[in-house]
Amino acid sequence: MIGDILPDILAECGLDRASPDIGENIFEMRQIRSLMNVAGRDINTRVEWSRAQGSFGVTSAAFGALPVDFQRMANAGAVIFDGNDHIPVRPCVSPELWQLLEKFPPEQPYYLLRDGRIYFTVDTGAEGALVRYVSANWVSGTDAVASNADVTIFPERLLAKGTVWRWKRQKGLPYDDLMAEFEADMESAARSDRGIQ
């Protein structure tokens, strides 16, 4: 919980608060909360955390709406048609190529992300398509810290270290060692999340 790491963050930053509450509307807490949210978004975008993975289905349609917590597509095999063959669907990133694919649909299906939707070159059929994505929600159910009871989807020590080095940088204090420690811990946590020693 955020309330568990907050006293340590404040101590590292040299801020003395009895019974700190991240939701308090005082300058120090607003500043720490802002840096914490910047650090949390950075940590969540740099690693495909197992608890940030989501999926949804699109059935009998040429397009489907993206979830509200959508951040980006999963790295490998993000879209698969669910028929007997489990056909992978390739991404299309160019609007010009998409126009060509719409006019001359290839055998290999493609998808395009645009305007909060995912579009397919062919109808997904009754079996549908499974779409895997990475959620923007790095705090349980939301994408920002608001209270001491909030819980992150990644190790909270990363959030603490990421917040502290950013605070020191903002104040013009030496932060290189803290940032290097954060980066090493981040790599270790990412490997651990993937089950790699």
Could you tell me what each predicted segment is?
Residues M1-Q197:
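Glycine-enriched, solvent-exposed interface loops adjoining structured elements
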